[in-house]
Structures are given as C-alpha cells and as structure tokens.
C-alpha cells in the first residue's frame, strides 16, 4: 500500500514577543493620546532632514514632540534632530538592520509620554528588515527619494503594503 506524505503546517509567529511588547506600547500611546510615527526609508533618502524640519515646525507651533533615532552606529542623526529643540534619544543597533519594540520601550523609559503629542521613530535605513517589526506605532511612513527610482514599491512591496503613507 502506497501512502501519501502528509504535510503538517505549524505556524508560529516568530515575532511573537515583539508583537506583545508593541501591543502594550500601542495601548499606552493611545491612553496618552500620543501619535507615534515610524519613519522607514533607505539610507541617505533624507529621513533625518525631513524629520528635523518637521520637528522644528512642530516645536515652533508649541506642539510637544520627541524623537527616537535608530542607527547602526554613531549618534550623528540624533544630534542633528536635537537641533530642532525637542528631546531626542539614540538607539545604536550595532549591526542589526531594524529597531525592535523592546529597544524602543527601553529608550522611552523615564520620558513623560503623557506630556507629548507626537513621537517620531527614525528607523534604521533599510527597506526590508523594519517592515516585519511592529514598534507600536500609530502610523508607518515610507519615505523615498526620486533618485532611488520609480520601481521601489515594486521591489519592496512589504514596506509599501504596510505603510500608511508614502512621502516622495
């Protein structure tokens, strides 16, 4: 008698712990009335310049804002954003290509989130890895520059399918 092989699919969410932390953060953010924006783009697209201008304008309008910056190494971008006058914290991933909810949660410790209206997360410059990691954000924004080519949404559907907004 010939038997047909059976395939048993077991799907375990690899990112389960991250998702649990992100859900808790999202609940906290919502309780505080805090809008959290996760900015995702390629390296060199202009995330930092775009965010610095945004933070500067929000500060000028009296809107309490802050930023968390993810980068492999250095605090260059965090120092640039701090020029806007808002609180900024740096997360160095030391080679990791994305931020994780736990990293963000640790770097938010001690901040009066209830006193903020906007929190921006400048994710590590990468169009692939950050897509899978929920950071508890209200909005995910994909930022791309014209010089990167018009086919980015086709090459990186994961990001553009999960983004709430794309800025060119």
Regions found by a protein language model. Name each.
Residues 47:
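Conserved lysine of the Walker
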Residues 66, 141-143, 160-168:
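Conserved beta-strand/loop subsegment of P-loop NTPase cores
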Residues 50:
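Hydrophobic positions on the alpha1 helix immediately C-terminal to the Walker A/P-loop
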Residues 156:
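Acidic, amphipathic alpha-helical patches
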Residues 43:
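The conserved Walker
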Residues 4-27, 31-34, 54-138, 148-151, ...:
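Nucleotide-state-sensitive switch-loop elements of NTP-binding domains
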Residues 39:
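Hydrophobic anchor at the beta1->P-loop junction of P-loop NTPases
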